[in-house]
Amino acid sequence: YGYSVNEGRARETINAIFDSECNLIDTSRNYGFGNAEKRIGQVIQERGGLPDDFVISTKLDRNMKTQKFDAARARKSIEESLEALKVDRIGLLHLHDPEHCKDITEITGSNGSLAELFKMKEEGLAETVGLAMGKTELMLEIIKEWPFDAIINHNRFTLLNRNADELYSYAYSNNISIINAAPYASGVLAK
């Protein structure tokens, strides 16, 4: 995070992940301006598919120019991800950073991206669904209303910051899997 990676290093890293005991890779259309999913997809294709029992985790993303994040945008986002990753379904599909959208009702309303996310799970486009965002208070409200399988939160549960404690306690108590992203504060606590 925070620096560019050339094609060779990216492919080498992705192959090393697939060859390791790791069984999950998390990405997004917005990571590397779309290059992250594309690079992962190229390696998946070269290898003849995903390794057995490997989980691709990616995210539905808002339109970065308009900040729009309704059901239509969510549907377009999954189509872009499936094409880039060269897979026909996603192991773990998150709704990404809804706190940055123009209008929260685009997310939570009856024609919102949340309803569309769960529809994608029903359709088999995603095996499991999650919520990925930073604002723990809003995240807690949302996971209390929707039957998520997982959450991913970043920089809110570190050695110095425990803002996600209530969120993680609720998730744990309700069998919602937790991915604690950036436990070293995006590298700040590791340098």
Task: Describe every region a protein language model picked out.
Residues I14, E37, G41-I44, I78-L82, ...:
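Generic structural signal for well-ordered alpha-helices
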Residues L82-I104:
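Active-site groove signature of glycoside hydrolases
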Residues Y1-F54:
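N-terminal binding-site loop/beta-alpha segment at the start of enzyme catalytic domains
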Residues D19, G41-V55, L82-D88, I142-W146, ...:
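Acidic (Asp/Glu)-rich catalytic clusters
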Residues Y1-G8, L60-R75, I104-E106:
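Active-site mouth loops of central-metabolism enzymes
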Residues A10, I17, I25, I40, ...:
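Conserved, mostly hydrophobic/aromatic
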Residues P98-K191:
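Beta/alpha (TIM)-barrel catalytic core signal, keyed to glycine-rich beta->alpha loops juxtaposed to Asp/Glu
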Residues C22, V87-I90, A126, F148:
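A structural motif
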